[in-house]
């Protein structure tokens, strides 16, 4: 026997087993495993009967959000606006749109949110303001303080716009202002002039505004259309892309109006200031970015290429919106998830967006028979889930509601119950028409039905509170082209296996090649129409899944099992010392 004695070996064994049993996973901050919920204020709840949602209505539903497992909510812009783009054209960043309430109402909302354990985020639009903003009016008049707050250029030689730039909504990105005698840039509508971030005073004013809302208790910001903030300083023509028709946004390759490096520096500086504020106040303030960009450009919002500067806590990840379609299979789904996870810098948090005010609703994109599947996936993937209001009751687009914008169909009033205007308002005339199927798809009806999308959503958000879901690793694979499986595991904790049948036919699959899983597992969550039932035991070597089915299976890991594993390992080590 080697010099190490038996007593020493047993002491080592005891110490190691003890260490393995009590080791804690890395601590996670609140946002790293949160369930976010986007509220479109105009459509959530009308408290005064004018047919328009408001802050008081949102405030009254904070307990509801807490009950369904929401950790944080972000509001589409509640700021004062002429509503040419329904709040994304801000005329006063320091005031609330009168239809929604006032600052007192906002303060009550923040208080009620925090009382219910919910963080409150604001949608912040840094790229532009309304053309009715005081700054723009003064800039037109060449007020020395505000003259360069916007991007102005003289007409091109011979007249006309300064260059060939096209707005996101089509047509020239330049509009001539006769009073000033120059063109102003607007990457969106002519009523949304671009702010000039090359002007230090403008940048200082916008930063000051962020702290105004932080001091009112806001927990962070979603930075809308962030990659449009800067333009090429030489204002060069953009090359033709070969896509789209002349005059359409896609007809140009936007190398001079998007993803300019200066954008990232502003985000990194704002992150530095948010972190400093967080340290002073003892609460984590976060930044989220929305940018339709390349994967390389998007990942730079997390951190700089040299990893010395931190940016957004989470860029928005829209891949599930784009890739989880009716025709998607398991291989394509896995590739979509890998696309984000394999490009994300180490130690950062992924986000998974199911829907938003700019996109068709889940039920309309994938069909009512697959809504529960999407909910299962996004709530069991690692990181943050981001849900759009009404997805918990499978709300659908309503094309006939379109009145102001082609995105109106997915912005219709929240469906609370079967009463007048779906319980959204006592007024029969609401700002957008209510979806006609509201009597079937609403909170009240689904709350009373334990086999509903609502309860499925609630079960999943509750499961997200488990330590494995918050801090565990993930492994995922496909079984053929039809079945996708995702394993979440954390040493010393129960493991969870999410399984999705992406096909419209029943299938029986063998998932036994996942290591460290027992052959028999318990069904933790099953979608309402599943072949499986919560609480039942199943054999993962022959798991039967219904069409478009999804289940979450649980493998219980006892402390005794963990100790036995450690003892087995160390006994093998002892044997090596004894018999070699």
Swiss-Prot record:
Effect on the protein upon substituting residue 265 to D: In strain: GEO
Membrane topology of this protein: Single-pass type I membrane protein
Entry EC number(s): 3.2.1.20
Localisation per UniProt entry: Membrane
Tree of life domain: Eukaryota
Keywords attached to this entry: Glycoprotein, Glycosidase, Hydrolase, Membrane, Signal, Transmembrane, Transmembrane helix
Effect on the protein upon substituting residue 230 to H: In strain: GEO
Leader peptide range in chain numbering: 1-19
Catalytic activity of the protein: Hydrolysis of terminal, non-reducing (1->4)-linked alpha-D-glucose residues with release of alpha-D-glucose
Listed transmembrane segments: 560-580
Gene Ontology terms describing biological process: carbohydrate metabolic process
Gene Ontology MF, one: alpha-1,4-glucosidase activity
Ubl conjugation as UniProt keyword: no
Reported tissue expression: In 4th-instar larvae produced in the brush border membranes of the gastric caeca and the posterior stomach cells (at protein level).
Assembly and oligomerization: (Microbial infection) Binds to L.sphaericus BinB subunit of the binary toxin BinAB.
Protein name, entry field: Alpha-glucosidase
Biological source species: Culex pipiens
């Amino acid at each position: 026997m080697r010099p190490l004695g038996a007593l020493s070996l047993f002491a080592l064994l005891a110490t190691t087993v003890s260490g393995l049993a009590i080791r804690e996973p890395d601590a996670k901050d609140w946002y790293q495993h949160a369930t976010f919920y986007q509220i479109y204020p105009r459509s959530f709840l009308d408290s005064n009967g004018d047919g328009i949602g408001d802050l008081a209505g949102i405030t009254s539903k904070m307990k509801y959000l807490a009950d369904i497992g929401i950790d944080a909510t972000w509001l589409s812009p509640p700021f004062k606006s002429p509503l040419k783009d329904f709040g994304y054209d801000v005329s006063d960043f320091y005031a609330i749109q009168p239809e929604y309430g006032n600052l007192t109402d906002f303060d009550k909302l923040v208080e009620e949110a925090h009382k219910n354990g919910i963080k409150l985020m604001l949608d912040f639009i840094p790229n532009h303001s309304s053309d009715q903003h005081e700054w723009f009016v003064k800039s037109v008049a060449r007020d020395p303080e505000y003259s360069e707050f916007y991007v102005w250029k003289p007409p091109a030689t011979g007249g006309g716009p300064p260059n060939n730039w096209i707005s996101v909504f089509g047509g020239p990105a330049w509009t001539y202002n006769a009073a000033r005698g120059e063109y102003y840039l607007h990457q969106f509508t002519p009523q949304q002039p671009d702010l000039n971030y090359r002007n230090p005073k403008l940048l200082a004013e916008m930063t000051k505004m962020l702290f105004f809302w932080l001091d009112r208790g806001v927990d962070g910001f979603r930075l809308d259309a962030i990659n449009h903030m800067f333009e090429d300083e030489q204002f060069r023509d953009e090359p033709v892309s070969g896509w789209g028709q002349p005059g359409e946004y896609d007809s140009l390759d936007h190398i001079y109006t998007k993803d300019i490096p200066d954008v990232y520096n502003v985000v990194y500086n704002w992150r530095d200031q948010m972190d400093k504020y967080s340290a002073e106040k003892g609460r984590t303030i976060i930044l989220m970015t929305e940018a339709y960009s390349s994967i390389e450009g998007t990942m730079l919002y997390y951190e700089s290429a040299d990893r010395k500067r931190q940016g957004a806590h989470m860029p928005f990840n829209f891949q599930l919106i784009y890739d989880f379609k009716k025709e998607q299979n398991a291989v394509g789904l896995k590739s979509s998830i890998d696309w984000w996870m394999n490009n994300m810098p180490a130690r950062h948090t992924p986000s998974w967006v199911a829907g938003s005010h700019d996109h068709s609703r889940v039920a309309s994109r994938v069909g009512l028979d697959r809504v529960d599947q999407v909910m299962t996936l996004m709530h069991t993937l690692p990181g943050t889930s981001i849900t759009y209001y009404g997805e918990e009751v499978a709300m659908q687009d309503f094309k006939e509601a379109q009145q102001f914008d082609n995105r109106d169909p997915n912005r219709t009033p929240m469906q609370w119950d079967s009463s007048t205007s779906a319980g959204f308002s006592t007024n029969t005339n609401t700002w957008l028409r209510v979806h006609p199927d509201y009597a079937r798809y609403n909170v009240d009806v689904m709350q009373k039905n334990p086999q509903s999308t609502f309860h499925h959503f609630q079960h999943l958000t509750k499961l997200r509170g488990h330590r494995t879901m918050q801090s565990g690793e993930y492994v995922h694979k496909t079984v053929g082209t039809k079945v996708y499986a995702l394993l979440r595991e954390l040493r010393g904790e129960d493991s969870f296996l999410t399984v999705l049948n992406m096909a419209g036919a029943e299938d029986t699959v063998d998932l036994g090649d996942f290591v460290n899983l027992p052959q028999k597992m318990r069904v933790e969550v099953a979608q309402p129409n599943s072949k499986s039932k919560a609480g039942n035991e199943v054999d993962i070597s022959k798991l039967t899944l219904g069409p478009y089915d999804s289940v979450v299976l649980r493998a219980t890991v006892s402390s005794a099992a963990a100790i036995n594993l450690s003892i087995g390992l160390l006994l093998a080590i002892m044997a090596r010392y004894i018999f070699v």
